[in-house]
C-alpha cells in the first residue's frame, strides 16, 4: 500500500489549523515538515516551533526533514516526532545520529540529494527505517521532478531486496499525478507531496487523484511482473 505524506511547505501558514484538518479529511497518511537553515540549503523555512505546533494539531504521524548543516544540534529538539530525516551529506558520523534518533523514540530516515550516490548509505541501509530520495534539489517547493532519479530508486530497491532489509523508500520532490506513477513503478513506498496537495483548491480531490495514480501504477507493475514470471516458467 502506497502512503502519502503532505508537506506543509506549500500550506497557508496563516490558516495552518484549517490546512491540517483539510489534509487529514482528504486521507493523507502523515505530515512532512521541512526545516531549512539557510546554510545546507539556500532557503530558510520552518523552525522548531512550527514542527512542534503541527504535531499538536494532528493525531497523524509527523516527519521532520532536517535540511540543516548541524544535525546534532537539532535531533534532541524533536523527541515528540514520529520520524526524523537527516541528510547523509550533512553528517560525519551517521551511526551516531541514527542511534540518537532511535534513543528518543523516533524512526530514523536518511535522505540523499539527487547527485549523491547510493554508495554513501550502503553501510547504514539496514539501520534506518527508510531512505528518502530527493527527486529535486532540496530547498524550494514547486520544482520539477528529475526523471533520471527513477534509475536511482530502482537501484536502491534492488539493494534493499538483495540484502533482505525491510527499509522503506520515500520519494520527495516534484510529486504529482504525472510523476507519482514513475516513482511507484521504480519502487517507492511513500510519496511526499507539497504543491500537489496544498496548492490545489480541492485538497480532498487532489489527494484522491494522487493516490489513485500511484495505486494504478502499482497494480500495473504487479500484473506486468506476474505475466513475465509466468512467461519464464513456460
UniProtKB/Swiss-Prot annotation:
Keyword annotations from UniProtKB, A to Z: Carbohydrate metabolism, Isomerase, Metal-binding
Binding site for substrate: 7, 65, 139-142, 172-174, 194-195
EC id: 5.1.3.1
Pathway(s) this gene product operates in, as recorded in its UniProt entry: Carbohydrate degradation
SUPFAM superfamilies: Ribulose-phoshate binding barrel (SSF51366)
Protein name: Ribulose-phosphate 3-epimerase
Binding site for a divalent metal cation: 32, 34, 65, 172
Species for this entry: Methanocaldococcus jannaschii (strain ATCC 43067 / DSM 2661 / JAL-1 / JCM 10045 / NBRC 100440)
PANTHER family to which the protein is assigned, alphabetical: RIBULOSE-5-PHOSPHATE-3-EPIMERASE
Residues of the active site: 34, 172
